[in-house]
């Protein structure tokens, strides 16, 4: 079982959504999958990122509600960002 390590930025992002119970319930399902190394179903569009986030993974928890993480392939996964495309990828 992997350890989930939330970054400081992820914690800030999480606070913005803490009152949206529906989104957080879906997020918890994804986090449990990551922790137990269960493959994330295709319906969440898990994929590798490029550019500034090369090597990181992303999935669509709900519509435009995204999770970005980095899997160290040891026993730790860094939870990096949480939010919409415009929030996470603005130039």
Predicted regions and their residues:
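PIN-domain endoribonuclease scaffold, especially VapC-family toxins
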Residues: 24-33
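A generic structural signal for short beta-strands and their flanking turns/coil linkers
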Residues: 27, 45, 55, 63-65, ...
């Amino acid at each position: 079982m992997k350890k989930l390590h939330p970054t400081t930025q992820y914690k800030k992002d999480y606070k913005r959504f803490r009152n949206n119970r529906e989104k957080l319930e879906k997020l918890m399902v994804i986090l449990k999958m990551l922790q137990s190394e269960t493959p994330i179903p295709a319906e969440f569009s898990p994929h590798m990122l490029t550019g500034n986030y090369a090597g990181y993974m992303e999935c669509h928890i709900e519509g435009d509600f995204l999770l970005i993480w980095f899997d160290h392939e040891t026993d730790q996964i860094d939870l990096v960002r949480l939010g919409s495309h415009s929030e996470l990828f603005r130039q």
